[in-house]
């Protein structure tokens, strides 16, 4: 009877143990087929219509954002993504999640579109970007997006390309909700991207 209970218990617990394997539980981008397909495109995903898609998505999430500003930001996102080898839709998603596309956003010492914590990076940012020497410099949209894309690229490199772990680093702590929201944003942009490509 005792052994039968142990056997039954192990049978019931096995699926739970399998779910807790690294890379399975809480996996968002690393196993998402849409993200992996876009990743396989390399720099091609930075070509048109990526900028149009991002501009449209920015205005969906922030209707008060002027059309020209959305267009300008989207072009900077695509250029920064190409420069640092990251996914432009991932960068755009971070911008929406972190600041709702507001260049003057400020929260708990984090600044700008990509909510970069100046106190944590005030030594490393000027080394990589000599023209950025203050919070005022960091808040300029082009600077902020380039620094954010650069940081994301560094986190990806340190985490062997694992996006979920890199997003945890970007946020500063593991967050299922953060990654889940970003993946939802990503899927929306991919949907817009395919519509643009086929129209």
Tell me what each language-model feature is.
Residues 9-17:
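Bacterial N-terminal signal peptides
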Residues 17-25:
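Sec/Tat signal peptide C-region and signal peptidase I cleavage site
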Residues 27-199:
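Catalytic glycan-binding domains that act on GlcNAc-containing polysaccharides
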Residues 1-8:
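Bacterial N-terminal signal peptides that target proteins for export
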